[in-house]
A protein has these predicted regions:
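Catalytic beta-strand/loop cores that center a nucleophilic Ser/Cys/Thr
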Residues: 1-62
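Active-site-proximal beta-strand/loop segments in catalytic clefts of secreted hydrolases
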Residues: 24-27, 70-74
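Active-site rim elements
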Residues: 37-41, 73-81
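Surface-exposed substrate-engagement region within the catalytic domains
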Residues: 43-46, 77, 88
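A short pocket-lining beta-strand/turn micro-motif at the edge of beta-sheets
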Residues: 47, 63-68, 76
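Long alpha-helical segments found as membrane-embedded helices
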Residues: 63-67, 98-140
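Cell-envelope and extracellular/periplasmic
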Residues: 72-73, 95-98
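Short amphipathic C-terminal alpha-helix that caps PH/PH-like domains
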Residues: 83-94
Length: 140
């Protein structure tokens, strides 16, 4: 169950190199996960919204790195447990920790309070007025 209100962004196909699509996105006719898909060109072809790829730095012939990429990740997308799990487990995979992911998946509970903001750009003043620091979210 992966759904977010962000758009399904178009990406250049085919994906480069050894990229492997993990999840395809579908444009829906509304803003609810239960809305039907849009017919026609918008979903043909379906666009990848999450994929993996390896890379190799120059001079590092014996080592390959792993990348997990997604076009999702707005603050509203994180309301979906499926989106949170996709991203967290994708990061575990990229770090070589996939064997530590249990069969039922990792817990990805939201650390309260969580108040996502709508899409848009914020002024510097907005962030100063919020006066939020990472330590404010430390769990007891």
């Amino acid at each position: 169950d992966i759904w977010g209100p962000t758009d399904v962004y178009g990406v250049r196909l085919p994906l480069p190199g050894d990229s492997q699509t993990v999840v395809f996105g579908q444009v829906l006719s509304g803003m609810k996960p239960t809305d039907p898909p849009v017919a026609g060109r918008k979903n043909n072809p379906l666009m990848p919204i999450a994929w993996t790829k390896s890379y190799q730095l120059p001079g590092q012939q014996s080592q390959k790195g792993k990348v997990f990429t997604t076009t999702m990740g707005s603050s509203n997308d994180f309301l979906s447990e499926g989106v949170r799990r996709l991203i967290v487990q994708g990061i575990f995979w990229a770090c070589g920790l996939e064997k530590s992911i249990p069969l039922q998946g990792l817990r990805v509970d939201i650390v309260p309070p969580y108040h996502p903001t709508d899409f848009g750009f914020r002024s510097d003043e907005d962030w100063v007025n919020k006066n939020i620091k990472p330590g404010d979210f430390k769990q007891p």
